[in-house]
Amino acid sequence: MIAVGIDPGKSGGLVKIHSRNNECSMHKCPGTTHEMASILRAAKNSSFVDSLPIMVAIEKVHAFPTDARSAAFKFGMNYGMWLGVIGALSIPFIEVAPQTWMKSYAPLPKIKQERKKEIKKIATEIFSEIYSN
């Protein structure tokens, strides 16, 4: 399987894991739908060439009432662009709430900035080989 995980936030990104050769690649969140499509198209092409299924898991996000309107709009636009590209390429996907995947790493700090730092630290430890390259 080729598994793709997407954090659609402004400072988010994408990770692609190829199960057959354990190849893992990471990308910062692209700024355009063209760049998004290019990354996902390459993943889909790999799945075709290697006769492997592909699945995308995208973080199911929403704006909070305390978010600035322009930031919330941009956040929603980015999420929608990802969904549009995934749909246009006919890639199967699931939406995963942050609380669902964060349970695996509990307990995490309550304060958002501290929580993000801790999650980044965990990811760095898990994917240390990739981060060092």
Named regions from a protein language model:
Residues 1-133:
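Phosphate- and other anionic-substrate recognition elements at nucleic-acid/protein interfaces
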